[in-house]
Curated annotation (Swiss-Prot):
It comes from Novosphingobium aromaticivorans (strain ATCC 700278 / DSM 12444 / CCUG 56034 / CIP 105152 / NBRC 16084 / F199). This is UPF0262 protein Saro_0143. Belongs to the UPF0262 family. InterPro entries: UCP032146 (IPR008321).
Length: 164
């Protein structure tokens, strides 16, 4: 019986140029939530008999997102199965918007009213949801996943794009 899920996720540390405490917290939460509950089935690997769980490494190479998928052998490693490459051009606007809204959100938490924070958070969720839908479209035919997993993956894609 297969177990089509991510059991381990890694971000290419060389890709991450800058972090702050707020973004680091977002990263930790996204990884924790992703490992706790996700649906992730790389179609080529699954059809070849590799039914999960999977290890996933996210990196940016030549301006493109690389999702490197390996079997999880239970010992911290596994066989490389495939690397799915996605162009990031369509994600630039949502990433930029997400960062701008997150910046406003983090500032608002410190000094705004509950209503103002809620308004900013709704905008943040809207951009996040739109980007997750876009990611689902881009993964179609390559990796089967669900909306919640795509949402958390988008958070991690954003972490890879932080510039100080």
């Amino acid at each position: 019986m297969g177990d089509p899920r991510i059991s381990h996720i890694e971000l290419d540390e060389a890709t991450i140029i800058w972090r702050n405490a707020d973004i680091e917290q977002e990263r930790r939460i996204a990884i924790f939530d992703l490992i706790e509950e996700n649906t992730f089935k790389p179609l080529r690997a699954f059809e070849a008999g590799h039914e999960g769980p999977y290890r996933l490494k996210l990196s940016v190479e030549d301006g493109r997102l690389a999702l490197t998928v390996s079997d999880d052998d239970g010992n911290g490693g596994g066989q490389l199965l495939e690397t799915v490459i996605l162009g990031l051009g369509r994600f630039r606007r949502p990433i930029r918007e997400y960062f701008a809204i997150c910046d406003s959100y983090y500032q608002a938490i410190r000094k705004a009213t509950a209503t103002e924070i809620e308004t900013i958070d709704m905008a943040r969720r809207g951009v996040h949801n739109e980007a997750a839908e876009m990611l689902l479209e881009r993964l179609q035919g390559k990796i089967d996943t669900d909306f919640a997993t795509a949402r958390r993956l988008f958070t991690l894609i954003c972490v890879l794009h932080i510039r100080g």
